[in-house]
Amino acid sequence: SSEKIMDFIIRCDPDVVQPLRNVVDDTYESSGLKNYIDTHNLGICFFSPLKHGLLTGKYTEPVTFTNGDHRSGVKEFQDTTLLKIILSNKTLLEQRFFNHPNPVLHGLVDSLLFDVPTGCVLLGQRNVQQVQAASTLGKLLTAKDAEWVKTLYSS
């Protein structure tokens, strides 16, 4: 977590840190990590920006993963209400960013980077289509668009 990184960052003196961050799980700023990164001009690489695919709207019904699959411990995959909200948000992202080839990914990923000049995200890409989709990302959102995306997932 960003909070845990802050507990050790001074002693470790890293060049780059890798916290969890997505539009649902986001303590990057509230933990003080953003301020530290900006002040010390460090690199940052966010992992789980799609929350294991959950935020893409790909899952419309609760899903059970096989034993050993890291997603089996993510309770949100079983939350019918949340899955409906995510599906609705997917539609809203598609409408707002209709001119982007991957509007959902654009909103979810690029909203994390709009004010992070030394940042990147780690996307788990398992096939050529996912690599091609990822290659369309990186066009920064405006502060207004980034805030709109985050607001979709904050309620």
Where are these regions (language model features)?
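Beta/alpha (TIM)-barrel catalytic core signal, keyed to glycine-rich beta->alpha loops juxtaposed to Asp/Glu
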Residues: 1-154
